[in-house]
Amino acid sequence: MKKYLISFLTLVLPFITFAQETQETGIDQQIDKAFKPFSDFFSDKIFFLVWKDPDIPFVLVLLVFSAAFFTLYFKFPNIRHFWTAISVVRGKYEDIEKHGATILYGEDGIAQGVDLNKVDDIEEHIDNIESLHSDLEIDGDIKETIRDESSHGEVSHFQALATAVSGTVGNGNIAGVALAIALGGPGATFWMVVCGLLGMSTKFVECTLGVHYRDVGEDGTVYGGPMYYLTKGLKEKGFKTLGKVAAVLFAIFCIGGSFGGGNAAQSNQATIVVKELLGWESTAAGFWIGVVIAFLVGIIIIGGIKRIASVTEKIVPFMAVLYILCCLYIILSNFSLLDDAIALIVKEAFNPKAIGVGGVIGVLLVGFKRAAFSNEAGAGSASIAHSAVKTKYSASEGLVALLEPFIDTVVICTMTALVIIIFNFGGFFEYGGDGSGSVFIDGVAYEGAGITSIAFHEFIPYSKIFLTIAVFLFAVSTMISWSYYGLQSWKFLFGRGKKADLTYKVLFLIFVVIGAAASMKSIWDFSDAMIFA
């Protein structure tokens, strides 16, 4: 621990010196000025257009059509296997792992209709089983069930889901939704939901592949993700060189994504709400908030995936439920406006009124872009976390993964959107704003999480305090998960040694500070580019 603390202080001290030297011009402005050309370069290169007026980037078309293809090819797994996925996460099959199929279920267990949930003493029940019904099993497994044999892996299905959800449920749900509505109007919500439903199939595919082609180290540590399934999968198909090149490119951009959308964008939004709550107008406020966040994240990410799973398993359900309850309170308190809000979402999805959105295609692109950023379906990042699950049945974890876009986009993003739309029935701002994502409320410019914050404050007294805490928790949990994604890609490129680990973590913490200090536009342009790449 001491050496990590020394490394962190070595990282921070030069920034402190730089901060003292730039008090007059403002360190936040200096960092933003230095970072903007870097952000613009990547944004221009990644989002090259296949069509102009409206602008349609190739990468967005690729993601959407891939999701539609997987949905049709696998016959709507997002609908047919939804309840099976919930059963796996709930641990329905844990008794099978603990006791074994041949012992747990026999003629007295299933054939005679005994409900094991109502058995007083399951151990006594097992002891009393004298005969088995062989027709119920195939190679020791019960028919029509999924068995978690724990042959390899580090975490449970639920922990893998929590780690991955914490990477998707973040400020894309709070700030991203507000940005989508500010730019595209209420209709953007409809297309976000559509993208989320299609994205469930994409998550199913990429996480199944992640488990199927994962590597297991000599010490039992699991390494997985697109860099592994691209290499192995394409090699099996006779495209060895293409697989290696694709894997290296993914690893590079995944590292970029961990610095951008999974890091800088999160600290950026956390800083915005903290500054607004505290009324901190200092030209170095973002920098110092970033230093604090970097310190907290640095302590957590030293633990590795097992500690990340432990932390996110506790944080994610709590913050998601609390945030949803607040959204529900606002929505139900204004229940008479709910049907109007839903009608407006559907109407403006096909007949948008937002200033400068560019018609149906424009609002569709806004919704799809923000949904893809929020749930990361197609980005491949979630398969890194899911590859660490304890199972030898890859498809079972694919089923678990398809729940993520539903939780993230269909549920949480939609609730955020309804709160903002109901709030704006009071005519507080014009949809479309100035075209940059900012809107003016009572003459004051608001953007991202700031829009959501003022909407909450209208209905819940002192909600700015709650939302600041929620944004902060979402940000930290997302950064924790993305640090793991980026580190796995870093190890793929540079090896699995301790020095490689430390180098990545130092760079990761630097981007926490950059994200907090730089402007929202620069950070989100860079983040979008890295996630979509």
Language-model segments: which ranges?
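Extracellular/periplasmic helix-exit of transmembrane alpha-helices
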Residues: 21-22, 206-219, 327-344, 352-354, ...
